[in-house]
Amino acid sequence: MPIKLDNKLPALDVLRSENVFIMDENRASSQDIRPMEVLILNLMPTKEVTETQLLRLLANTPLQINVEFLYMASHKSKNTHAEHMETFYKTFDEIKDKYYDGLIVTGAPVEQMPFEEVDYWQELTRVFDWSKKHVYSTLHLCWGAQAGLYYKHGVDKFPLSEKLSGIYKQTVDMPENFLMNGFDDSFVSPHSRYTEVTLEDIKNKTDLDVVASGQEVGLSILASKDLREVYSFGHFEYDRDTLAREYRRDLEVGINPDVPANYFPGDDPSQEPKLRWNLAASTFFSNWINYAVYQETPYRLEELEDDFSFYGYL
């Protein structure tokens, strides 16, 4: 099924060129079914790239989805034109009285900072608090997952000895979990981070299930039993060349990074990387939309206001 977007969003041209089924506002308004309402809190600096990555995956799901984008007004974006932000993004004050079936909180390149030192931290915590009564299921990605665990459950992050960057094997620990429907026993996906959370903290401070993990990546996917909280520390959404661009960016600023693991053929950065996680990515996002959101969300989203007591937040 298609994804519905603003007719003028630049990502539309890219997605249509890839034969992704997109429904514009005019066509969508003639359909008499309730689409899923999804809000994307995009914390990444390259916002248009992240938009396209996430929309590509959402468009592969079997449901019509209305997507809105949220940004943190307390942070000034340096890598995206103001006109783009004003046209396609909303502030928290503009959406705080609305309700959504799903919320996606992206990663952000701030993971080596204490959470409280991130300039939009207070605004982000307002979004987390608001989501209890206004969102059915929240999917937290990478730093967004760490931020959610820290604020909602008191689980802190810890520095790794070196950056984890590459394509890594992970094992499905809960094949009975709906998020893993259609997965093989193991899968690969990109990871790119300097920090991690520990299994001990997850067991001691939360009631979350470990859905997937890996020998090299540690925890990979966590979820509450009702799937209203989902945490993914990897980057299913990454393009074929995203890790390559990150690697070259780090080289240019003198970080001297290791070559991303299991990524370039023969570990040769001059070679084009192999895309090996596309099926897992599409399956994961389809499962989240279908099982965590569509199958359980109320038809009248306002009902979320009356039933949020089972959230395990602090």
UniProtKB/Swiss-Prot annotation:
The active site is at C142, H235, E237. It catalyses: L-homoserine + acetyl-CoA = O-acetyl-L-homoserine + CoA. GO terms for biological process: L-methionine biosynthetic process from homoserine via O-succinyl-L-homoserine and cystathionine. One of its GO terms (molecular function) is homoserine O-succinyltransferase activity. Substrate binds at K163, S192, R249. It is found in: Cytoplasm. Keywords: Acyltransferase, Amino-acid biosynthesis, Cytoplasm, Methionine biosynthesis, Transferase. The record marks S192 as: Important for substrate specificity. This is Homoserine O-acetyltransferase. It comes from Streptococcus thermophilus (strain CNRZ 1066).
